[in-house]
Structures are given as C-alpha cells and as structure tokens.
Amino acid sequence: MMLEARDISFGYGDRRLYDGLSLSFAPDERVALSAPSGFGKSTLCRILAGYEKPWAGQVLVDGSPLPRPGRGAALPVQLILQHPETAVDPRLRMRKTLAQAGEVPERIIEGLGIRETWMTRFPHELSGGELQRFCIARALAAKPKYLVADEISTMLDSVTQAQIWRFLLSECREQGIGLVLVSHSPALTQRVATRVVDLASL
C-alpha cells in the first residue's frame, strides 16, 4: 500500500513552499525528510497526514485519496507531533485519551513503558516524555499503514529517546507500517532511516 504525494503545491500567503512536489513511500521504508529549517518539513508532514489541504495536488494511499481527519474514517496515516501537549485534549484523563483510538493492545502499553498510575492523570500532570508515549500508543492502536513522526523525540532525554525509538521501529517492522520522519539529529536519521529525501534538491 503506497503513500504518494502527487504534484503538491502549498504555501502561506505569498510564500510558496512547494510547487508540484511529488514523493512516494513504500510500506517497508523508513524515510527521513531532510531540508534546512523553515523549509516546510512540518507542513509537509501535516499534508501527508491529511491535516493540511494543499493548494493543488493530492495525497493518495494505495491509489485512493487520503481520508480527512475527523470524518469518521479509519485514518491510514497517523501523525505524531514534536509537542504532544498540542495533540491531546487537556480536559481528558489519559485513559480516555488512549480510548480515542479504540482498544490499545497491552504489548503497546508495556512496550512504551506506560504506567497504570499515569492513566488517571491529566496531560498537564505528565512530563513531555510520558505524554509522548501516550500519543505514540494512540497512533499505533489506530492500526495505521503509515506513521509520520515530526521531531517526536527532540525534547526527550536520551534514555527515553532510545526506548521510544526501539519500540517504534520494532512495531513498524512487525506490523508492516511505513515510517516518514523528520529529525534534526544526523545520528538518529542514520540509525533509523532506510532512505533520506533532500527536499531542497527536488
């Protein structure tokens, strides 16, 4: 099941970020998007996951248009953000946040090190690393075909980074999930990615 960005054009106001950009991703790939700061990598992540509508062009999954978030359809592309606090409802306890994706397999909860005591807390009562684990668990529980990970471990300590990436890569391999990632860490990109796309050269 291919993920394809076809002839994407997008910008803000008079500033055009992309003009006829085309990319494709296979389900067995882990693709890093590389470009200078301010180039629009996060914007492209949002477009690939359906959270931003391009001026022109479309995103396809297995040849069909990507469903838009919030329309009741199971989303084949899940977006994980750098700042998890922006991706959760601050009024919900974490157990209800997880439940938004349906039933979360115990292997995901255990693999990400999510503690039972965290389940009854609100987002503001958790650290960034703890909250990010919930966001990743929710994304995986949705049984996506692709994950788009936008700087998901930048704000985390090295131990938490290693644990999260180890589990995430294992799940992607075992469940056949394609991965698109953005990271400013060359070491992480080298360790994780099977292919690097230099957006500035396209």
Task: Describe the predicted segments one by one.
Residues 143:
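Conserved catalytic motifs of ABC-family nucleotide-binding domains
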Residues 64-78, 92, 96:
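ABC ATPase NBD coupling module
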Residues 122-126, 130:
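Conserved ABC ATPase signature
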Residues 136, 148:
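Hydrophobic anchor residue at the start of the ABC signature
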Residues 49:
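Helix-to-loop junction immediately C-terminal to a conserved catalytic motif
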Residues 3, 17-20:
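Conserved structural motif at the start of ABC-family nucleotide-binding domains
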Residues 83, 90-105:
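Q-loop/switch helix immediately C-terminal to the Walker
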